[in-house]
Amino acid sequence: MLDLKLLQNNPEVVAEALAKRNSGIDITLFTALDQRRRELLLEVEALKSERNKASGDVARMKRAGENADALIEKLGALSDRIKTLDAETETVKAEVHQWLISLPNIPHESVPAGADENDNVFLHAWGEKPSFDFTPKEHWEIGPALGLDFERGSRLTGSRFTVLWHWAAKLERALTAFFLDVHTREHGYMEVYPPAMVNAQTMTGTGQLPKFEEDLFKLRDSEYYLIPTAEVPLTNLHSGEVVPEEKLPIAYTAQTQCFRSEAGSYGKDTKGFIRQHQFTKVEMVRFAHPEKSFEELEKLRSHAEVLLQKLGLHYRVVTLCSGDMGFSAAKTYDLEVWLPGQDKYREISSCSNCTDFQARRANIRTRLADAKKPVFLHTLNGSGLAVGRTLVAILENYQQADGSVVVPEVLRPYMGGVALLTPDGPF
């Protein structure tokens, strides 16, 4: 959520930022609402002052034995008017709040301007594209013989669900454990196992609600939602709290199942394991000092990159342009892994600094040594990594002509020493 004072005092700054995001939001609607709110508060204050004076006059007249009926009648009318205006004020305040929580974050000054993914800016790349003496296959061609069962997943539930057997299941488990070990042992993250269901307030805290409800799975006759990412529960762990400055930065990591309706993805990635309604992801969340969050963003990105480097997977990093960033982000880097079967790069991690946007919504503050009162800290999040997409990248990059897949060396201890996945299926 944006700072109300920023909107009131510098509406042109917010309008310019929203224009960069191509949000289509008209700032004058807020200005009119906020002006009406101020007018109501002034009018109520004036009426209450008048009522107080009239109450004093009634008391004085009664002490003097004078008839105060007319003034008492006026007092009743004033009270009725105040009651009406108070109700209208609350309605307008609620409208202002709803308008506020529908606004996206303001892009950082370093974010390139642009309309969509075509305007994202290349930052750097690591590694080389693998070479093959055969035409590399896509993962949905290799996968079934190694345990990716799209047919049974569809039969059990529906489209965009997959059953993992044997090598595929072992590889998913190995990747998850490997990611968590690197984060906790090498980068100082604390592992957390959060609920997979959260309430509406929690979803609002990180920005999924109210704007993106259609992207979520909600339990019928309940206020609970299935989480689309562990970012949601991890960030809200400190909602309503004041975190001591000396504890910053705080770093959490979690592996969870994630659930997304993919409402806006009709026709995209209908084949394979790239875009699922249910998938495993390891998430990184950091809570930072307000003046150090962009330094923390570079750390966060490097922690995601290290995983791809250890796996020997070629990737590139792009800075998202203003029109392609997520709702809560002030700046985002995307890590895109190379998939030789598809002959393209695919996103495998997004690392974002949300500045004080989520902290303001979830009321997460810190008490700085030189501040008189607590201030909102900054929150950051990133995929470390999307497990299913990493599995896809391994299948496509390490495939052999006979359909087998070489296991990256760092994963072999997690696979019981297995170095080669042989096509034993379909199962």
Swiss-Prot record:
* Positions bound to L-serine: 229-231, 283, 383
What's in the GO CC field?
Answer: cytoplasm
Gene3D superfamilies, alphabetically?
Answer: Bira Bifunctional Protein, Domain 2 (3.30.930.10), Serine-tRNA synthetase, tRNA binding domain (1.10.287.40)
- Cytoplasm is among the record's keywords: yes
Superkingdom, according to UniProt? Bacteria
- Pfam families, per the entry: Seryl_tRNA_N, tRNA-synt_2b
Do you know which CDD domains this protein is assigned to?
SerRS_core
| Gene Ontology terms: biological process | selenocysteine biosynthetic process; seryl-tRNA aminoacylation
UniProt xrefs under PANTHER family = SERINE--TRNA LIGASE, SERYL-TRNA SYNTHETASE
Q: What the record says about its domains? A: Consists of two distinct domains, a catalytic core and a N-terminal extension that is involved in tRNA binding.
What's the name of the protein? Serine--tRNA ligase
